[in-house]
Structures are given as C-alpha cells and as structure tokens.
Amino acid sequence: MPRVKTGVVRRRRHKKVLKAARGFFSGRRKHFRKAKEQLERSLVYAFRDRRQKKRDIRKLWIIRINAACRLNDINYSRFMNGLKLSGLELDRKILADMAMNDSAAFASLVATAKAALK
C-alpha cells in the first residue's frame, strides 16, 4: 500500500480549530493542542449555559414581579395564588413586563388577586 501523508487534512483541521479559537487568550489561541482543549471546554460551557440562561431569565421575571407586588402590599406567592384563584392565566414574562412598564395595570391585577384571596 502507498504511504498516506496527512499534510492537507491536518492543515485543514488545525485551521478550523484555530479559527474557532479566535478571541481566546494567549496559548489557547495560538497552540493547536491547547486551543482544541479549550474549544471542547467552551462548547461544554455553551451547552450548559443555554439551559442556564432560561432559568436565569425566569428568576429575573420572578424578582421583578415580587418587587412590584411588595409595592402593592402583597408578596409574590400570595399574588400568584390569587391570580390562579381568580382564573387569570398570565405568564411570568407578561407579568414582569407589566410590572416594569405599566404599573397601573399591574396594580389592578394585584387588586383582582387580593379580592380572589378573600
């Protein structure tokens, strides 16, 4: 069998990894082995953090809703329970947006929730 040389394939593979490692610091950008290891690690971080991002956004919505609720003399859990009892089904994204941008409408929701709790 003839001898197979990997020059072209290796060059292409190295270029692909080093191109993806642009923006990394020091040897993690310049040296193939370190760049490859860091690239694998960064892809793991990216995978994990795409899921973490969803949790963080939801936490932020809950914090915003709770802050607006406390301005209206009710806490978050009682407010959400009151909304559920009154039959209003608004998701946390919409509630957080209302709490930030339309405080009058949010105050009316709080009043509805308080009435349902009594």
From Swiss-Prot:
Source species, domain of life: Bacteria
An annotated Gene Ontology molecular function: structural constituent of ribosome
Protein name per the record: Large ribosomal subunit protein bL20
One Pfam short name: Ribosomal_L20
A biological process from GO: translation
Provenance organism: Aliarcobacter butzleri (strain RM4018) (Arcobacter butzleri)
Job description of the protein: Binds directly to 23S ribosomal RNA and is necessary for the in vitro assembly process of the 50S ribosomal subunit. It is not involved in the protein synthesizing functions of that subunit.
InterPro entries: Ribosomal_bL20 (IPR005813), RIBOSOMAL_L20_CS (IPR049946), Ribosomal_protein_bL20_C (IPR035566)
Keywords: Ribonucleoprotein, Ribosomal protein, RNA-binding, rRNA-binding
Family: Belongs to the bacterial ribosomal protein bL20 family.
